[in-house]
Design a protein with these regions (language model features):
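Phosphate-group recognition and catalysis centered on beta-loop-alpha active-site segments
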Residues: 1-143
Length: 143
């Protein structure tokens, strides 16, 4: 199962650390985990991480080198969504809004499944504020 840390959270939401580049580095390298980040790009050169607003300045080099540390992705995987039930990512994953179910196995990612007790069996992966809950022997697993 693909396990994705939502904004760098590991054991619950922590707004003081969300989208913080140093914290994200610790998650990607230390835990070998993918991280979903909120990226703002202005004039194709200025880049920032942050949820409700641009907060942490980064550059393309930071973004590019981190993708090499992600255990699954070998290129950027990006998407945009608001409250749509499903969004297709650039790498063909189905990004499922919290509470949206799928019934056949697919390349779908359950977002925040803990909010609605989503049945995870048909999903390829999850994006959560609680990735530690899904680790068994340091491997992502459905518990």
């Amino acid at each position: 199962m693909l396990l994705i840390s939502h904004r760098g959270n590991v054991s619950g939401s922590d707004p003081s650390l969300e989208n913080n580049p140093d914290h994200i580095d610790r998650i990607i390298v230390g835990m070998e985990m993918n991280v979903e980040i909120d990226l703002y790009v202005f004039d194709q050169q200025e880049m920032y991480l942050g949820h409700d607003q641009p907060q942490y300045g980064i550059d393309f080099k930071w973004l590019y080198t981190r993708r090499n540390n992600c255990p699954v992705n070998d290129h950027f995987n990006y998407f945009w969504h608001q409250i749509d039930n499903f969004t297709l990512t650039s790498k063909g994953y189905i990004w499922a809004y919290p509470g949206c179910e799928i019934h056949l196995p697919s390349r779908a990612i359950a977002v925040m499944p803990e909010e609605s007790k989503t049945n995870l069996r048909p999903f390829y992966g999850i994006c959560t504020d609680y990735p530690e809950r899904y680790l068994v022997n340091d491997k992502a697993s459905i518990i």
